[in-house]
Amino acid sequence: STSRGLGDVYKRQVIKPLVKQPTAFAIITDNQTYANTKDAMHQYKTAVEDDGLATYLISGDWQNPDQVKQIIIKTYQECPSLEGLVLIGDVPVALVRNAQHMTTAFKMNEKAFPWDQSSVPTDRFYDDLNLKFEFIRQDSVNHQHFYYKLTEDSPQRLNPTFYSARIKYPEKKEGDKYAAIASYLKKAAAAKADKHNQLDRVFSFNGASYNSDCLIVWMDDEKAYMENFPLAFGRQMGFKHWNFRMKHPMKYKLFSELQRKDLDLFMFHEHGMPTGQLINDELACTDFNNRYKMLKSTLYNAVMSHVGKRDKDTLRIQMQEKRQVNEVFFKDLDNPKFWEADSLHYADERIVTEDLMKRNLSTNPKMIMFDACYNGSFHENDYIAGQYIFNDGQTLVAQGNTRNVLQDRWTIEMIGLLSHGVRAGQYNKLIVSLEGHLFGDPTFRFAPIEANTLSTDITIHKDDKAYWKNLLNSPYADVQSLAMRMLADADTQKELSPLLLKKYRESGFNTVRMEAIKLLSRYQDDNFIEALREGLNDTYEMVARQSAIYAGFVGDDSLLPAIVEALVEHNERLRVQMSANKALSLYPKEKVEKTIEDFYAKVDRLNENEEKKRLLRSLERMFVQEAKVHQTLMDVAAPEAKRISAIRNVRNYTFHFHVDDYLNVIRDAGNPQEVRVVMAEALGWFTNSVQRPHILEEIKKMQQTANLPEDLKAELEQTIKRLSL
């Protein structure tokens, strides 16, 4: 039956589910959006219920995010099988501070930069009820934005209670936003009638400068895709795998692909900004004319970038002398036709929201992934992901980030679950980050390869170990990975580590091996170290790369020979090389140099002495730089700002061998309070370090110190929570 609850201060209305189902879903919107899209909203609600989810429809005149959260908590208490929610229209946005360790890469100084830039817009405020937040203030310009701080005594890891998504119209698109939202909801409702569309048409594109343009990364992705999307392989044109090198400009070919009505999933692996996607970089110049054009554009732009600071003619003459060109070279400096052609050339290298609006482009892939920075910036008045769901095409779901994101993240983790009828939101919840969001209908799903009940069982059998053990030998890689994840989540006694190492060693599935290593990182035992040692030489580039990254995070000396071998023997893997190089910089200099000497004593390589010297020289530069930074960090006479900058560097470079020095900085009451607090925060990044137990023990002792400043006490508490397994 339908019931309405009215009469509270923000005119809340709750329409309860019309049907009983094993699990439930909530649609949350504001009263104005509801009033203007009522018919479409109810069509969507009915379609979701027909697809197996008991559905609540909740609207209100929300004054702040806490009011929305209260109704979510109330609904969850009433219905513990609530699995997900969608926020439609003008639902307040929480911008979170003091939680950068929950992002993949965002590390902006919250004290030095404006709040709207240094906070993270995130719906984890709504979907992760384990987290504790403290309200700070409403934004003075955008009244839909509210700042919160993650409290120090909150859990410090993401563990969402539900999945979530936003359906938020990009205001810059103009037009009637309510008509656009209604149109989208009708599209999403109508799509549910197709119960037979399997995930068998997939497109993957790698943009310029992504993952160092490494061709091994691009090639090895296909090893995973064959496991993720078995139906897309072995049939005509089921899978396309492009990268930017294939065409310049590539964007117009991509526009054609985006209009294919048979396409199920489109993955953009690229760099981005809120309103743009980087597709190509500068064209490689292979003939004289193109080289001349490139030189002309570069020097003309160099002159114009300084106009205003100095006179244009003076700048031109200086450039002629500096670059040894004559006056005729600059004859087009004031020619509008040159600048028009130049700007078109630059524009061809990017897809921007203006392109999509001007062309009124209909995008048709059912789901689109943007693993770039900022493409999911729904808090802005325009954002890439929003443009792809609000058009006349068939796109129902987009995945994007509100802040910058780590390139080396395993972006396609678990994506193959979509091949097995798992809902888009359920998949996204498994790979959660503070900045990562879904846009559109999170209940969307493809028809499974084989009939199953996975999408319900993820909620209903969450803690049923016997159920998940039974799926460990599924014929499908992603189902095995899901089973391992569910077992690890339920492993309160920390007993699963031997099984995960066994899985790593025995599985022929690349993605299962990668999931095993990721889960072993929770255990930080000998099995994890052993998996890393073998993983550095794994046939799947992503396993080798993540093993190199973890090897740096861990700092276990026994890994040094394997890191050096990966660095030298596999230099075609550019991201593995970069990660191994960084990892070596986090180990003591003498041990690294000895390992390199030992390695070269045993191998036969062309010009091995010269190669060894080059490697030692490049590492020496890193060690010298590190020693300088550490000296500044420890120097009580150095300016406070410089010391803090050196300490903040430790968040990215966890020098395990300096931990005792770092602890002394915190202990020393003679240090400025801010230096001690920032140092305590930096130690929270040693989550995988061999020094973690030692750090924990020492800072727990510090907590007992008399007259500890409140800020420092709070930071120590947060660091203890971050480092506790």
Where are these regions (language model features)?
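Short inter-helical turns and helix N-cap capping residues of alpha-solenoid HEAT/ARM repeat scaffolds
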Residues: 475-476, 508-509, 539-541, 571-573, ...
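Structured catalytic cores of large enzymes
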Residues: 1, 8-19, 47, 65-248, ...
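Structural detector for internal amphipathic alpha-helices that build alpha-solenoid repeat scaffolds
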Residues: 478-491, 511-523, 544-556, 575-590, ...
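Caspase-like cysteine protease fold
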Residues: 411-494, 510-518
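Catalytic cores of nucleophile-dependent amide-cleaving enzymes
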Residues: 118-184, 293-410
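Structural recognition of the beta-strand scaffold that forms the well-ordered cores
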Residues: 26-28, 55-59, 84-88, 201-206, ...
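Amphipathic alpha-helical scaffolding segments comprising HEAT/armadillo-like alpha-solenoid repeats
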Residues: 461-470, 491-504, 525-536, 556-568, ...
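Acidic, contiguous N-terminal accessory segments
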Residues: 8-50, 55-60
